[in-house]
Amino acid sequence: MNSIKISGLVGSSEYDAIADDSLKDEDNAAWVMELEPCVREEWIERIGWIRLIDRLAENELVDSGSSEFRKFYFGWKWLLLWGRVKPGCAYQEILTRIAARWFGASSTPVDRLSLWSWNRYLKAIACYHGHNLIVDTLAQYETMLKDLGGAYFQVLPFLAPEQWQAACYFGALDQFFNNLRDIQEDAQRGICYIPTDVLNQFGVTREEIIQQTACQNPGYSKMMQFLLDSYLAELRQKAYPLITADDLHPSWAILRDWSVHRYQRIERVFRECNFDYTQFPQQYWSEVQQDLPLLIAQVRQQYGTARKPTNRFLKRNTTRMPVLLRTIGRKVVKVAGTVLNRPSFSGQESS
Protein backbone atom coordinates (compact mmCIF):
# COMPACT_ATOMS: atom_id res chain seq x y z
CA MET A 1 0.00 0.00 0.00
CA ASN A 2 2.80 2.45 0.90
CA SER A 3 6.41 2.62 -0.27
CA ILE A 4 7.08 5.42 2.23
CA LYS A 5 8.25 4.14 5.62
CA ILE A 6 7.27 5.48 9.01
CA SER A 7 10.95 6.06 9.84
CA GLY A 8 11.16 8.45 6.90
CA LEU A 9 8.35 10.61 8.29
CA VAL A 10 9.40 10.95 11.93
CA GLY A 11 13.04 11.99 11.58
CA SER A 12 14.74 8.64 12.18
CA SER A 13 18.54 8.80 12.03
CA GLU A 14 18.71 12.27 10.57
CA TYR A 15 20.90 13.96 13.13
CA ASP A 16 23.37 13.29 15.91
CA ALA A 17 21.97 10.90 18.48
CA ILE A 18 22.93 7.67 20.16
CA ALA A 19 21.90 5.10 17.59
CA ASP A 20 20.59 4.63 14.08
CA ASP A 21 16.97 4.08 15.00
CA SER A 22 15.25 3.77 11.64
CA LEU A 23 14.91 0.01 12.12
CA LYS A 24 13.63 0.56 15.67
CA ASP A 25 10.91 2.83 14.35
CA GLU A 26 9.94 0.26 11.73
CA ASP A 27 9.88 -2.48 14.36
CA ASN A 28 7.66 -0.33 16.57
CA ALA A 29 5.34 1.27 14.07
CA ALA A 30 5.67 0.06 10.46
CA TRP A 31 1.98 -0.89 10.65
CA VAL A 32 1.00 2.79 10.80
CA MET A 33 1.63 3.17 7.07
CA GLU A 34 -1.13 0.65 6.34
CA LEU A 35 -3.87 2.71 8.01
CA GLU A 36 -6.42 4.77 6.13
CA PRO A 37 -4.91 8.17 5.23
CA CYS A 38 -6.96 10.25 7.66
CA VAL A 39 -6.13 7.88 10.53
CA ARG A 40 -2.51 7.43 9.47
CA GLU A 41 -1.86 11.17 9.54
CA GLU A 42 -3.03 11.43 13.14
CA TRP A 43 -0.61 8.70 14.18
CA ILE A 44 2.31 10.12 12.21
CA GLU A 45 1.77 13.53 13.78
CA ARG A 46 1.85 12.23 17.37
CA ILE A 47 4.74 9.83 16.76
CA GLY A 48 6.61 12.66 15.06
CA TRP A 49 6.24 14.90 18.10
CA ILE A 50 7.41 12.15 20.43
CA ARG A 51 10.37 11.17 18.26
CA LEU A 52 11.42 14.80 18.02
CA ILE A 53 11.58 15.04 21.81
CA ASP A 54 13.48 11.76 22.13
CA ARG A 55 16.07 12.83 19.64
CA LEU A 56 16.52 16.36 20.93
CA ALA A 57 17.16 14.90 24.39
CA GLU A 58 19.58 12.30 23.08
CA ASN A 59 21.44 14.94 21.11
CA GLU A 60 22.15 16.67 24.41
CA LEU A 61 23.68 13.42 25.66
CA VAL A 62 26.10 13.09 22.75
CA ASP A 63 26.80 16.83 22.46
CA SER A 64 27.38 18.57 25.77
CA GLY A 65 27.05 21.93 24.03
CA SER A 66 23.55 21.21 22.76
CA SER A 67 20.51 22.65 24.48
CA GLU A 68 17.83 21.82 21.91
CA PHE A 69 15.60 19.81 24.24
CA ARG A 70 15.81 22.51 26.90
CA LYS A 71 14.84 25.11 24.30
CA PHE A 72 11.79 23.09 23.34
CA TYR A 73 10.90 22.42 26.97
CA PHE A 74 11.13 26.13 27.80
CA GLY A 75 8.76 26.89 24.93
CA TRP A 76 6.37 24.21 26.10
CA LYS A 77 6.32 25.47 29.69
CA TRP A 78 5.56 28.97 28.41
CA LEU A 79 2.68 27.58 26.36
CA LEU A 80 1.40 25.63 29.35
CA LEU A 81 1.58 28.70 31.59
CA TRP A 82 0.12 31.31 29.25
CA GLY A 83 -1.96 29.23 26.86
CA ARG A 84 -0.16 30.62 23.83
CA VAL A 85 3.15 30.11 22.04
CA LYS A 86 5.94 32.54 22.88
CA PRO A 87 6.70 34.53 19.69
CA GLY A 88 10.10 33.71 18.25
CA CYS A 89 10.74 30.75 20.53
CA ALA A 90 12.60 27.66 19.35
CA TYR A 91 10.37 25.11 17.59
CA GLN A 92 7.60 27.69 17.36
CA GLU A 93 5.87 25.95 14.46
CA ILE A 94 5.60 22.59 16.21
CA LEU A 95 4.48 24.21 19.45
CA THR A 96 1.85 26.08 17.44
CA ARG A 97 0.60 22.75 16.05
CA ILE A 98 0.40 21.35 19.57
CA ALA A 99 -1.43 24.45 20.81
CA ALA A 100 -3.94 24.18 17.98
CA ARG A 101 -4.52 20.53 18.84
CA TRP A 102 -4.92 20.67 22.62
CA PHE A 103 -5.51 24.25 23.77
CA GLY A 104 -8.49 26.52 23.41
CA ALA A 105 -12.14 26.73 24.38
CA SER A 106 -13.05 23.87 22.06
CA SER A 107 -10.66 21.39 23.68
CA THR A 108 -12.24 18.11 24.71
CA PRO A 109 -11.67 15.97 27.81
CA VAL A 110 -9.44 13.73 25.69
CA ASP A 111 -7.41 16.77 24.61
CA ARG A 112 -6.90 17.76 28.22
CA LEU A 113 -5.82 14.24 29.14
CA SER A 114 -3.40 14.23 26.21
CA LEU A 115 -2.00 17.59 27.31
CA TRP A 116 -1.46 16.26 30.84
CA SER A 117 0.27 13.12 29.54
CA TRP A 118 2.46 15.12 27.15
CA ASN A 119 3.61 17.33 30.02
CA ARG A 120 4.32 14.23 32.09
CA TYR A 121 6.35 12.77 29.23
CA LEU A 122 8.47 15.91 28.84
CA LYS A 123 9.12 15.99 32.59
CA ALA A 124 10.21 12.34 32.42
CA ILE A 125 12.57 12.99 29.51
CA ALA A 126 14.13 15.86 31.45
CA CYS A 127 14.47 13.65 34.53
CA TYR A 128 15.67 10.36 33.07
CA HIS A 129 17.94 11.40 30.20
CA GLY A 130 21.33 11.75 31.82
CA HIS A 131 24.69 9.99 31.96
CA ASN A 132 24.64 9.72 35.75
CA LEU A 133 21.14 8.34 36.13
CA ILE A 134 20.76 5.79 38.91
CA VAL A 135 17.44 4.15 39.72
CA ASP A 136 17.56 3.11 43.37
CA THR A 137 14.57 0.82 43.81
CA LEU A 138 12.25 -1.40 41.81
CA ALA A 139 9.36 0.87 42.79
CA GLN A 140 11.22 3.86 41.35
CA TYR A 141 11.93 1.84 38.23
CA GLU A 142 8.23 1.18 37.71
CA THR A 143 7.51 4.86 38.17
CA MET A 144 10.03 5.55 35.42
CA LEU A 145 8.35 2.99 33.14
CA LYS A 146 4.99 4.70 33.62
CA ASP A 147 6.37 8.23 33.30
CA LEU A 148 8.12 7.40 30.03
CA GLY A 149 6.27 4.55 28.33
CA GLY A 150 2.94 5.09 30.03
CA ALA A 151 2.72 8.78 29.20
CA TYR A 152 3.98 8.07 25.66
CA PHE A 153 1.11 5.68 24.98
CA GLN A 154 -1.44 8.04 26.51
CA VAL A 155 -0.44 10.76 24.03
CA LEU A 156 -1.22 8.54 21.04
CA PRO A 157 -4.44 9.30 19.12
CA PHE A 158 -7.84 7.55 19.22
CA LEU A 159 -7.58 6.53 22.87
CA ALA A 160 -10.86 6.72 24.79
CA PRO A 161 -10.82 8.30 28.29
CA GLU A 162 -11.95 5.05 29.89
CA GLN A 163 -8.85 3.33 28.45
CA TRP A 164 -6.40 5.94 29.74
CA GLN A 165 -5.13 4.07 32.79
CA ALA A 166 -4.91 0.77 30.95
CA ALA A 167 -2.84 2.46 28.24
CA CYS A 168 -0.43 3.72 30.89
CA TYR A 169 0.25 0.21 32.16
CA PHE A 170 0.58 -1.13 28.63
CA GLY A 171 3.07 1.65 27.89
CA ALA A 172 5.02 0.72 31.02
CA LEU A 173 5.20 -2.85 29.71
CA ASP A 174 6.42 -1.50 26.38
CA GLN A 175 9.13 0.55 28.08
CA PHE A 176 10.30 -2.51 30.02
CA PHE A 177 10.84 -4.43 26.80
CA ASN A 178 12.57 -1.47 25.17
CA ASN A 179 14.95 -1.29 28.13
CA LEU A 180 15.57 -5.03 27.87
CA ARG A 181 16.26 -4.73 24.15
CA ASP A 182 18.66 -1.83 24.64
CA ILE A 183 20.77 -3.00 27.61
CA GLN A 184 23.96 -3.12 25.53
CA GLU A 185 23.26 0.17 23.76
CA ASP A 186 22.63 1.88 27.09
CA ALA A 187 25.75 0.29 28.61
CA GLN A 188 27.85 1.67 25.78
CA ARG A 189 26.82 5.18 26.82
CA GLY A 190 27.39 4.49 30.51
CA ILE A 191 23.79 3.94 31.56
CA CYS A 192 22.24 1.07 33.52
CA TYR A 193 18.51 1.25 34.21
CA ILE A 194 18.41 -1.87 36.39
CA PRO A 195 17.56 -0.69 39.93
CA THR A 196 20.29 -0.69 42.55
CA ASP A 197 18.29 -2.83 44.98
CA VAL A 198 17.86 -5.53 42.32
CA LEU A 199 21.56 -5.44 41.42
CA ASN A 200 22.50 -5.74 45.09
CA GLN A 201 20.05 -8.57 45.68
CA PHE A 202 21.88 -10.73 43.14
CA GLY A 203 25.42 -9.49 43.69
CA VAL A 204 25.73 -7.73 40.35
CA THR A 205 27.33 -4.30 40.02
CA ARG A 206 26.38 -1.41 37.81
CA GLU A 207 29.96 -1.32 36.55
CA GLU A 208 29.68 -4.93 35.35
CA ILE A 209 26.58 -4.06 33.33
CA ILE A 210 28.21 -0.97 31.81
CA GLN A 211 31.52 -2.71 31.11
CA GLN A 212 29.56 -5.60 29.55
CA THR A 213 31.14 -8.23 31.80
CA ALA A 214 27.99 -8.99 33.83
CA CYS A 215 27.31 -12.26 32.02
CA GLN A 216 30.41 -13.70 33.69
CA ASN A 217 28.79 -13.16 37.10
CA PRO A 218 26.60 -16.16 38.12
CA GLY A 219 24.23 -13.75 39.84
CA TYR A 220 23.44 -12.02 36.56
CA SER A 221 21.44 -14.94 35.12
CA LYS A 222 19.50 -15.28 38.36
CA MET A 223 18.75 -11.56 38.28
CA MET A 224 17.42 -11.71 34.73
CA GLN A 225 15.31 -14.76 35.61
CA PHE A 226 13.79 -12.76 38.45
CA LEU A 227 13.05 -9.80 36.18
CA LEU A 228 11.54 -11.91 33.40
CA ASP A 229 9.80 -14.61 35.42
CA SER A 230 8.62 -12.64 38.44
CA TYR A 231 8.62 -8.88 37.91
CA LEU A 232 7.49 -9.04 34.30
CA ALA A 233 4.48 -11.11 35.34
CA GLU A 234 3.36 -8.22 37.55
CA LEU A 235 3.70 -5.73 34.69
CA ARG A 236 1.71 -8.01 32.39
CA GLN A 237 -1.05 -8.36 34.93
CA LYS A 238 -1.42 -4.59 35.20
CA ALA A 239 -1.47 -4.27 31.39
CA TYR A 240 -3.99 -7.08 30.98
CA PRO A 241 -7.10 -4.82 30.71
CA LEU A 242 -5.76 -3.30 27.51
CA ILE A 243 -4.30 -6.58 26.22
CA THR A 244 -7.75 -8.19 26.36
CA ALA A 245 -9.88 -5.12 25.50
CA ASP A 246 -12.35 -5.72 22.67
CA ASP A 247 -13.54 -2.13 22.24
CA LEU A 248 -10.34 -0.41 21.11
CA HIS A 249 -10.18 1.82 18.07
CA PRO A 250 -9.06 -0.35 15.10
CA SER A 251 -5.67 1.34 14.98
CA TRP A 252 -5.16 0.68 18.68
CA ALA A 253 -6.09 -2.97 18.21
CA ILE A 254 -3.33 -3.25 15.62
CA LEU A 255 -0.86 -1.38 17.86
CA ARG A 256 -1.66 -3.69 20.75
CA ASP A 257 -1.33 -6.93 18.78
CA TRP A 258 1.75 -5.77 16.88
CA SER A 259 3.39 -4.75 20.15
CA VAL A 260 2.60 -8.02 21.93
CA HIS A 261 4.19 -9.88 19.02
CA ARG A 262 7.26 -7.66 19.35
CA TYR A 263 7.46 -8.30 23.10
CA GLN A 264 7.32 -12.03 22.48
CA ARG A 265 10.17 -11.75 19.99
CA ILE A 266 12.33 -9.68 22.36
CA GLU A 267 11.85 -12.08 25.25
CA ARG A 268 12.32 -15.20 23.14
CA VAL A 269 15.56 -13.98 21.57
CA PHE A 270 16.85 -12.74 24.92
CA ARG A 271 16.28 -16.17 26.45
CA GLU A 272 17.79 -17.92 23.43
CA CYS A 273 20.92 -15.81 24.00
CA ASN A 274 20.98 -17.01 27.63
CA PHE A 275 20.40 -13.40 28.72
CA ASP A 276 23.66 -12.31 27.05
CA TYR A 277 22.85 -8.73 26.13
CA THR A 278 26.07 -8.44 24.10
CA GLN A 279 24.86 -11.15 21.70
CA PHE A 280 21.22 -10.11 21.65
CA PRO A 281 21.26 -7.14 19.23
CA GLN A 282 22.70 -8.94 16.23
CA GLN A 283 20.29 -11.86 16.50
CA TYR A 284 17.27 -9.71 17.31
CA TRP A 285 17.63 -7.16 14.53
CA SER A 286 18.31 -9.89 12.02
CA GLU A 287 14.99 -11.48 12.98
CA VAL A 288 13.22 -8.12 12.77
CA GLN A 289 14.39 -7.63 9.20
CA GLN A 290 13.06 -11.05 8.26
CA ASP A 291 9.83 -10.64 10.21
CA LEU A 292 8.70 -7.19 9.11
CA PRO A 293 7.67 -8.00 5.51
CA LEU A 294 5.56 -10.92 6.73
CA LEU A 295 3.85 -8.83 9.40
CA ILE A 296 3.14 -5.99 7.00
CA ALA A 297 1.62 -8.42 4.51
CA GLN A 298 -0.61 -9.78 7.26
CA VAL A 299 -1.72 -6.29 8.28
CA ARG A 300 -2.54 -5.42 4.68
CA GLN A 301 -4.56 -8.58 4.21
CA GLN A 302 -6.57 -8.51 7.41
CA TYR A 303 -6.85 -4.78 8.10
CA GLY A 304 -7.80 -4.13 4.50
CA THR A 305 -10.85 -6.38 4.74
CA ALA A 306 -11.93 -5.89 8.34
CA ARG A 307 -11.65 -2.51 10.11
CA LYS A 308 -13.72 -3.13 13.22
CA PRO A 309 -12.21 -2.83 16.71
CA THR A 310 -12.84 -6.49 17.45
CA ASN A 311 -10.68 -7.73 14.56
CA ARG A 312 -7.14 -8.92 15.26
CA PHE A 313 -4.32 -9.10 12.75
CA LEU A 314 -2.21 -11.28 15.03
CA LYS A 315 -3.99 -14.24 16.61
CA ARG A 316 -3.88 -14.25 20.40
CA ASN A 317 -5.26 -16.55 23.04
CA THR A 318 -7.61 -14.34 25.06
CA THR A 319 -8.74 -17.13 27.35
CA ARG A 320 -5.62 -16.78 29.50
CA MET A 321 -2.78 -14.40 30.18
CA PRO A 322 -0.46 -14.44 27.14
CA VAL A 323 2.69 -16.37 27.94
CA LEU A 324 4.93 -13.50 26.86
CA LEU A 325 4.15 -10.11 27.31
CA ARG A 326 10.82 1.05 22.74
CA THR A 327 13.42 5.98 19.64
CA ILE A 328 16.21 7.64 18.52
CA GLY A 329 18.56 8.96 15.51
CA ARG A 330 20.68 12.11 13.52
CA LYS A 331 20.91 16.14 12.78
CA VAL A 332 18.92 18.30 15.17
CA VAL A 333 18.42 21.11 12.71
CA LYS A 334 16.66 18.71 10.36
CA VAL A 335 14.28 17.16 12.86
CA ALA A 336 11.74 19.96 13.07
CA GLY A 337 11.82 20.29 9.31
CA THR A 338 11.22 16.58 8.90
CA VAL A 339 8.12 16.72 11.09
CA LEU A 340 6.80 19.99 9.68
CA ASN A 341 7.47 19.31 6.01
CA ARG A 342 5.77 15.93 5.84
CA PRO A 343 2.58 15.82 3.73
CA SER A 344 0.11 16.23 6.59
CA PHE A 345 1.60 19.55 7.62
CA SER A 346 1.41 20.92 4.08
CA GLY A 347 -2.17 19.82 3.52
CA GLN A 348 -1.26 16.93 1.20
CA GLU A 349 -2.19 13.32 1.58
CA SER A 350 0.71 10.89 1.85
CA SER A 351 0.73 7.94 -0.45
Task: Please tell me what each predicted stretch does.
Residues M1-A105, D111-D174, L180, E185-S351:
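Catalytic cores of Mg2+-dependent Asp-rich isoprenoid enzymes
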